[in-house]
A protein has these predicted regions:
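Weak global preference for isoleucine
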Residues: 11-12, 45, 105-108, 124, ...
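Conserved blade-ending motifs and adjacent loop-strand segments that build the rim/top face
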Residues: 61, 98-118
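Blade-level signature of beta-propeller repeat domains, shared across WD40, Kelch, NHL, RCC1
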Residues: 113-140
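Beta-propeller domain segments
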Residues: 1-100, 134-137
Length: 140
């Protein structure tokens, strides 16, 4: 992503993800806020997931981890990521080359980075100076 879109990619060594010809799923010019009508997308790998800045989801994706912990079994195998301006933390499920679900699971002020402990539990670092642990709500 850049000025119009945010994206999540499945990384393949040597893969061409279209930077700076593409923003998300849209062709773009060298001006970061300008879309173009078309571009050469030969050999480019499309994002696994993308969202536009104009759809209200946010404007700055913060990459995370695939959840492999034991405390939040409902998230097992989901890719956890955040969006900085919206404070949303989401769980993205991608299977059979398609997004199966993308659910907001938490809100963290100014998410800056993710971390993972030796048990696979995920933590979120905030620009507010705190580290947040993801925990199940009572009864879940």
């Amino acid at each position: 992503g850049w000025g119009l879109w945010e994206e999540v990619n499945l990384i393949i060594k040597g893969g061409n993800y279209g930077w700076a010809t593409m923003q998300g799923v849209q062709c773009s010019s060298s001006e970061r806020h300008t879309a173009t009508a078309g571009c050469d997308q030969v050999d480019m790998i499309a994002p696994a997931f993308a969202y536009g800045h104009s759809d209200g989801r946010g404007a700055s994706v913060t990459g995370g981890y695939v959840y492999r912990g034991k405390q939040l079994r409902g998230l097992l195998g989901a890719y956890l990521y955040a969006d900085f301006p919206s404070n949303r933390v989401s769980a993205l499920r991608y299977e059979d080359e398609a997004v199966q679900s993308d659910d907001v699971i938490a809100s963290v002020p100014m998410p800056a980075s993710f971390g993972e402990d030796e048990s696979g539990e995920v933590y979120i670092v905030s620009f507010s100076g705190f580290i947040y642990a993801l925990e199940a709500l009572p009864g879940e």
